[in-house]
């Protein structure tokens, strides 16, 4: 006890020193100044105010359930969302080690605290009113250093109340502690508070120690909040950045021997991983936002409080209690959030009149008893060490700690959050409140990822866990589809509402990469669109406040758009399952955002229960991930051109069906020096997006020496700039590895070729890993079920580098597109300026597979001796005889009396007329007879008899 009292005395002396410095700046005089720690308040069990509320649900996931954190959240949402919060108890085997307990951290690392005045959380006077009072009942009121909570720094001390306009009730900065010291101080506090017969400085007998139960602590806590008779001050280590202090979960250390901690470091329930798991849209936020994506640590003591609040952007939150005493939570269902806010304003009118955003400050409590009286449902959860608490979107929650403990929390955003997040940012705009992240960036990132997964699924029919998750939120009724459609409708309405005075420009790809772009008036995020003017090119407005930006003439004002409305509606159709739209946006994912599609990011699909090591990427996959990350920045600059480019419509067939066309014509952005075609509103007050055009101000330099050398090497590989020579040389090098087997169904042939199942060939071509060298590619035909044949091209030495499509031509287009990306990485100039790459544009996929090579054709045709694939053989007959068969109802030239070609001799003209009258089947049979290919002996005998009769006839 002496040791605890000594520690408390040193803490109080430090606190007193800080308060004395505040006193000198304050206009109010304290009644007394303590020279020793005084915890004068005592437990009063007879006046306990424990609220009568129902308990929130508790869930006990099985090991299988625990494998997929987001899947489990999705599973329990329907059962728990109506409570606002729930408790999750992990399987018994899941017990991650806590690095915070290591001696170097536990005894040596210090963290800052805040002083909380528990008796003032609900019952206090407004700041302005309290500063006018000359005499205070409580000595400390004059010493409160008013603070403002910031997500970035946690606690930012203001000017100690010297200015009424600046002072806001909050948490005063307290002393720094180590975890060991804080635990001892909490023990001292509880011994003093709950054992009134002992003086704080005397020894307490072990048999007299009393450990209050949770219900005792809860009753006393709300007595202090509702009807305090004494001053109760505690400390709270809140909002501690884990990047600085350290996380309570182990982190993976590459290069070190694998241990038990490493298994937990890669677990999905490790809060360092949770926010960016596959399926959480926060995965598309590239910045490590402290408190949202990077967890915060919370070190509590008895009665330390987290006041009523809702998560930023109405996100889900997950809290894990690493060690220590329980934490009592209270939750309100999200659909009662507005009712809760109204009750708070009704019961605390003076505080809200002075500070309308009071609920954003996390400094005010209101008893669950009062809330229930007003008809607001409240639920309780008691979290113990090793357990999780999940809060749902827009669910207000609060609580207090029963003693010393360490907890960690982070946000997560499954797809069902998107509708809540959209409502949040629209509300922030009306309140003119800054946001923590870009909702539109997350929405578009999720939509593009889902589209790419749909594209992969349409080709391979393989449902990986990631693809299956995105597939579930698509279709017309899918959660993601609905969220994107709603946002596109909003964007269209806002564009159409701007009736005059604005031209449209294409937004730069990196418009908001290096700095946040927000509306000058309401702070709305401007990732999707922004309004500006030549008079203030670095000042922007949202579409709602576009007309409030300035009063300049219409010719000087413009709107920047990241995607046209046609493109956005195509994205909606893609999510609904339209194959053409899927193809278009999958191409955009590959070409425009190569660092964002799944193949580049290569998820580590995290497991647990207990944590299973995540699947590692091969060296090739890791190299591809790193390379594409570097290429993406270069790609953004390459896709611009120094000439004006007309943006193609979504409906254009060449854009829909060929990714390379959208790559050539896409423009990432402009600045104020760009030439812009003004686009006025058309009939009905709508923008005519067909007229949007832009001109880049950054023409690329072609002076790079390394690029020149690369061009020479590429020329050498392709056989020079002669396109025909290059492709001819490549076609001759096709090696047939397997002819496969015939499939007599639609789609398994075309007019140009037969596609045997299991067909496999080898060809040399520029390497997608190193374009300066040739490598072997394996081309094969697989069975994709109802889709028919699936064409796949893979690098022979690195099979994980593969490209698949339902079209042989497009399959090789994907290879050439990848080649362009690799060349961009090595060459600092546009692909369009590399004339040596022109042969890439003429590469024929059928030829690269070998389907146009004579030796391959002969082998493949032998698989169909009966000519069952009529589409192919009919076209072949036409080519052989040089005449189209006469369609039913048509007449040939001779019947019409048309003149015959005089250059042909009489016999040829007669033969051509005869052949035109034949059906395709008859032509094929005749060809077989004349060439000796038919095996039908009866037909051969009939033909011989016919010839004999013709010779006998006069």
From Swiss-Prot:
Its cofactor is Fe(2+). It is found in: Nucleus, Nucleoplasm; Nucleus. A zinc finger (C5HC2) spans 519-571. Residues 1-46, 148-170, 641-670, 884-905 are annotated as: Disordered. Changing residue 387 to K: In jmj14-3; loss of transgenic photobleaching phenotype due to RNA silencing. Pfam families: FYRC, FYRN, JmjC, JmjN, zf-C5HC2. GO terms for cellular component: nucleoplasm; nucleus. The record marks 290, 298 as: Involved in histone H3K4me3 recognition. The record marks 312 as: Involved in histone H3Q5 recognition. Belongs to the JARID1 histone demethylase family. This is Lysine-specific demethylase JMJ14. It comes from Arabidopsis thaliana.
């Amino acid at each position: 006890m002496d040791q605890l009292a000594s520690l408390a005395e040193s803490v109080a002396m430090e606190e007193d020193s800080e308060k004395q410095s505040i006193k000198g700046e304050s206009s109010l005089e304290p009644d007394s100044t303590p020279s020793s720690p005084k915890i004068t308040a005592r437990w009063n069990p007879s006046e306990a105010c424990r609220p009568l509320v129902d308990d929130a649900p508790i869930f006990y996931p099985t090991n299988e359930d625990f494998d997929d954190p987001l899947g489990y959240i999705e599973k329990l949402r329907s059962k728990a969302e109506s409570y606002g919060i729930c408790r999750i108890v992990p399987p018994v085997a899941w017990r991650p080690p806590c690095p915070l307990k290591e001696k170097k951290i536990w005894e040596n690392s210090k963290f800052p605290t805040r002083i909380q005045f528990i008796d003032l959380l609900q019952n206090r006077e407004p700041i302005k009113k309290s500063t006018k009072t000359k005499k205070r009942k409580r000595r400390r009121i004059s010493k409160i250093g008013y603070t403002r909570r910031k997500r970035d720094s946690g606690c930012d001390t203001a000017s100690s109340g010297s200015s009424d306009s600046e002072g806001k009730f909050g948490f005063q900065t307290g002393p720094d502690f180590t975890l060991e010291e804080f635990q001892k101080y909490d023990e001292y506090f509880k011994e003093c508070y709950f054992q009134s017969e002992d003086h704080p400085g005397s020894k307490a007998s072990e048999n007299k120690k009393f450990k209050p139960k949770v219900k005792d602590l809860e009753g006393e806590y709300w007595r202090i909040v509702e009807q305090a008779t004494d001053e109760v001050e505690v400390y709270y280590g809140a909002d501690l950045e884990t990047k600085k202090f350290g996380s309570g979960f182990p982190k993976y250390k590459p290069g070190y021997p694998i241990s038990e901690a490493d298994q937990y470091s890669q677990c999905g329930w490790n809060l360092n991983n949770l926010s960016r798991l596959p399926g959480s849209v926060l995965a598309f936020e590239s910045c490590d936002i402290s408190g949202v994506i990077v967890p915060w640590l919370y070190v509590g003591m008895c009665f330390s409080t987290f006041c009523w609040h809702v998560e930023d952007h109405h996100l889900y939150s997950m809290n894990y209690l690493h060690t220590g005493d329980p934490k009592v939570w209270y939750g309100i269902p999200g659909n009662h959030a507005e009712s809760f806010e109204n009750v708070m304003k009704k019961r605390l009118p003076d505080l809200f009149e002075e500070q309308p955003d009071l609920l954003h400050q996390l400094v005010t409590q209101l008893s669950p008893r009062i809330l229930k009286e007003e008809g607001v449902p409240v639920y309780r959860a008691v979290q113990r060490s090793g357990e999780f608490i999940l809060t749902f979107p827009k669910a207000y929650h609060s609580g207090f700690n029963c003693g010393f403990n360490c907890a960690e929390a982070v946000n997560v955003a499954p797809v069902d959050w998107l509708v809540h997040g959209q409502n949040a940012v629209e509300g922030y705009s009306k309140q003119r409140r800054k946001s923590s992240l870009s909702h539109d960036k997350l929405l578009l990132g999720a939509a593009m990822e889902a589209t790419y997964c749909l594209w992969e699924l349409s080709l391979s029919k393989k449902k990986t866990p990631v693809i299956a998750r995105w597939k579930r939120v698509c279709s017309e009724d899918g959660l993601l589809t609905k969220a994107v459609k709603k946002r596109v409708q909003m964007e269209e309405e806002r564009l159409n509402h701007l009736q005059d005075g604005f031209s449209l420009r294409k937004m730069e790809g990196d418009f908001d990469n290096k700095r946040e772009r927000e509306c000058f008036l309401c702070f709305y995020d401007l990732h999707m669109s922004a309004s500006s003017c030549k008079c203030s090119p670095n000042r922007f407005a949202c579409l709602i406040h576009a007309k409030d930006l300035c009063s300049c003439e219409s010719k000087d004002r413009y709107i920047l758009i990241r995607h046209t409305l046609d493109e956005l509606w195509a994205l909606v159709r893609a999510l609904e399952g339209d194959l053409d739209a899927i193809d278009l946006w999958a191409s955009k994912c590959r070409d425009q955002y190569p660092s964002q599609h799944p193949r580049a990011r290569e998820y580590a699909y995290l497991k647990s229960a207990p944590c299973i090591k995540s699947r590692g990427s091969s060296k090739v996959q890791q190299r591809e991930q790193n390379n594409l990350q570097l290429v993406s920045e270069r790609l953004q600059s390459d896709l611009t051109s120094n000439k004006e480019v007309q943006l193609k419509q979504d409906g254009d067939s060449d854009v829909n069906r060929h990714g390379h066309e959208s790559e050539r014509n896409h423009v990432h952005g402009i600045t104020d020096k760009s030439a812009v075609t003004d686009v006025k509103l058309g009939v009905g007050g709508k923008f005519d997006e067909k007229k949007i055009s832009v001109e880049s101000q950054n023409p690329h330099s072609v002076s790079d020496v390394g690029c020149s050398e690369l061009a020479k090497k590429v020329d050498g590989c392709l056989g020079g700039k002669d396109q025909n020579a290059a492709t001819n040389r490549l076609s001759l090098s096709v090696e047939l590895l397997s002819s496969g087997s015939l499939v007599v169904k639609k789609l398994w042939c075309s007019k140009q070729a037969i596609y045997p199942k299991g067909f496999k060939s080898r060809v040399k071509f520029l390497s997608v890993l190193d374009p300066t060298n040739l490598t072997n590619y394996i081309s094969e035909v697989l069975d994709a079920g109802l889709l028919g044949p699936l064409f796949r091209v893979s690098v022979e030495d690195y099979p994980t580098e593969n490209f698949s499509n339902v079209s042989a031509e497009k399959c090789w287009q994907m290879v050439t597109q990848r080649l362009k990306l690799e060349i961009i990485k090595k060459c600092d100039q546009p692909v369009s300026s590399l004339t040596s790459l022109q042969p890439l544009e003429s590469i024929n996929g059928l030829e690269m597979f070998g389907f146009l090579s004579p030796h391959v054709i002969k082998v493949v045709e032998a698989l169909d001796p009966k000519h069952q694939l009529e589409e192919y053989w009919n076209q072949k007959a036409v080519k052989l005889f040089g005449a189209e068969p006469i369609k039913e109802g048509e007449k040939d030239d001779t019947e019409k009396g048309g003149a015959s070609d005089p250059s042909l001799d009489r016999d040829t003209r007669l033969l051509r007329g005869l052949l035109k009258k034949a059906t395709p089947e008859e032509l094929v049979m005749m060809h077989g007879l004349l060439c000796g290919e038919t095996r039908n002996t009866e037909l051969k005998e009939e033909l011989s008899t016919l010839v004999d009769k013709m010779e006998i006839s006069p």
